[in-house]
């Protein structure tokens, strides 16, 4: 097939997208496809008319514009097959507040999600924030707590705060970059990520990956710097817990309407899976989680990207 790989973008994850995109493009070439790398930069509007020439597009943009439903809406209007979830799913998954509400509602409706909980959370707006509200946040969420942007990826802008002073500093600093922040209960346990891919139209859960970062948590540096994280696959969980988490993740994936490939992150503590987020366009670098899980499942990187692009074309 004649394929285009959408990479780069205008978000703070641009460099990671380029790393992922170039690796994907080479893998697709290895599988016999003709591939162009399309940099989604400030001049992308002038490239739109050329997109129809491709049989399909592999979208590996991260963050704003690429992962939040905007690019998906553009590609839908053009009518070209693309990898990843559609507009509605992308909008919800990229918005951590909306996604928490969605998963909360899903937990209430399905018995197999009884293993899942969502850490307590608050949405804080820069317009409404006052220093005096720190005490209210501490009372409702407790310390330590996690501060993260409502809409962002790769743990950019994320802090773990152990005191009111750290919480105040984190909010003040991040409100320079974001209008809204989430303050969430900190759960200390096994940090895991569960990848799901579609195989012949059937969502399939890959082996659970346990993350043991050398830093306090799996932040941007730990994700993309070699040697900063120990990866355990399969995760060191008992069989019953593993089975329950797999069923729960599959239900979340299907209920949200995820397509082709996604990753669901969380913390396991005392047999409970504390949901953190859904990533509908997970990284595909040499250090990324989903390719590791696929490899443990017996799928090479070249086979993985070939499978994903072919799944995207199934909807024709």
From Swiss-Prot:
PANTHER family linked: D-ALANINE--D-ALANINE LIGASE, D-ALANINE--D-ALANINE LIGASE B
Cellular component GO terms, alphabetical: cytoplasm
Example GO biological process: peptidoglycan biosynthetic process
The organism of origin for this protein: Fervidobacterium nodosum (strain ATCC 35602 / DSM 5306 / Rt17-B1)
Cofactor(s) it depends on: Mg(2+); Mn(2+)
Catalytic activity: 2 D-alanine + ATP = D-alanyl-D-alanine + ADP + phosphate + H(+)
Name of the protein described by the UniProt record: D-alanine--D-alanine ligase
Residues annotated as binding Mg(2+) 2: 277, 279
